[in-house]
Design a protein with these regions (language model features):
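N-terminal Rossmann-like NAD(P)+-binding domain of SDR-like oxidoreductases, especially those catalyzing
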Residues: 1-138
Length: 138
């Protein structure tokens, strides 16, 4: 969804030197596949919008899958971006990374200050880990 919107915007602005892959074309959970892609394409800019997402039922019944898959996607792409000298990486977070009862509007300093919404906690934790990995590489 977000990745498709980014692609549409780039095309509208007449950018032509880019490559996108669907999850069917590139499994971002596979570290070797991600590194092979980066070695072949040598991207300068990376937009990390990919994630395993679902509704409340899926989030509650497949908690380990959401955590594992999203951690793998994030760590593989962020590490490859670092390893292959990507100029800029845009990592998309989510409002669910903030505490369930956070005051609105959300502020960056609210991160990790209280409990997360239980139904999407694994997804949120993977997003937070991605943010912290980006901060660490920066």
């Amino acid at each position: 969804m977000v990745g498709s919107a980014i692609e549409r915007k780039l095309r509208q602005e007449w950018f032509t030197n880019f490559c996108f892959r669907t999850s069917a074309e590139l499994d971002l959970r596979n570290q070797k596949a991600v590194e092979d892609f980066f070695a072949l394409e040598e991207p300068e800019y990376v937009f990390l919008a990919a994630a395993k997402v679902g509704g409340i039922l899926a989030n509650n019944t497949s908690r380990a899958d959401f955590l594992y898959d999203n951690l793998a996607i994030n760590t593989n792409v962020i590490h490859a971006s670092y390893k292959f000298w990507v100029k800029k990486l845009l990592f998309l977070g989510s409002s669910c990374i903030y505490p369930k009862m956070a005051t609105q509007p959300l502020r960056e300093e609210y991160l990790l200050t209280w409990l997360l919404e239980q139904t999407n906690e694994p997804y949120a934790i993977a997003k937070i880990a991605g943010i912290k990995l980006c901060e660490s590489y920066r």
